[in-house]
Amino acid sequence: MALLEICCYSMECALTAQQNGADRVELCAAPKEGGLTPSLGVLKSVRQRVTIPVHPIIRPRGGDFCYSDGEFAAILEDVRTVRELGFPGLVTGVLDVDGNVDMPRMEKIMAAAGPLAVTFHRAFDMCANPLNTLNNLAELGITRVLTSGQKSDALQGLSKIMELIAHGDAPIIMAGAGIRAENLHHFLDAGVLEVHSSAGAWQASPMRYRNQGLSMSSDAHADEYSRYVVDGAAVAEMKGIIERHQAK
């Protein structure tokens, strides 16, 4: 049966995902940046309360995946922290200036991660040569790759995803970006074994007083009185679709 991973941005969201049938959580901060390293407090609280596998993302900033020496030092420190806290896996990725896997740096990450399952995140979708990159990741011992098939969403990239799956047995190819209940069947019918979804919705802030004349964001038009949360009903619906597909 296909595995359902849900991207979560808080302990509450991780618990919602778990309660509604998620098989695994990718734990992140900063949804508008595409996911950044969660705080130590969030990591500890999730580790204590969530019982399904949780893989934190290790990504120090938004933007590209070519990092300064200082940023890379922080990545290694965060990898060690996640390992010490007892998480079963993590999600990360580093490219060089030419859009290839930064092999020396990824080797250091793999050494720091030790026995943890490492997912190479959507840095893969920004690489120059996906098949060569997949070979490099297999050489490193990467467990899985999260990809949209190098398109803006995974449905558009499904043909590339299938090409990657056909390329070899390892790493596992996990489809992600824009996967919802209404298009999930396309991936299941294609034989994709792992799917990643935010199953998310924007929820209004509980604040009654709102200073509408001031923003804490560099984007003056950002809505600071809403929060991105996991929609438990959406998770349950996707899980049900997977189970019914398996029963066919």
UniProtKB/Swiss-Prot annotation:
GO cellular component term of the entry, any: cytoplasm
Say if the entry is tagged with keyword Cytoplasm: yes
- Which keywords does this chain's UniProt record carry? Cytoplasm
Listed disulfide bonds for this chain?
none
Q: Cross-referenced Pfam families, in alphabetical order?
A: CutC (PF03932)
What InterPro entries does the record tag this protein with? CutC-like, CutC-like_dom_sf
Q: Which domain of life is it from?
A: Bacteria
Determine if Kinase is one of this entry's keywords: no
Query: Matching Gene3D superfamilies, A to Z?
Result: Copper homeostasis (CutC) domain
Instruction: Spell out the family assignment given in the record's similarity comment.
Output: Belongs to the CutC family.
Q: How does it assemble?
A: Homodimer.
- Record-given protein name: PF03932 family protein CutC
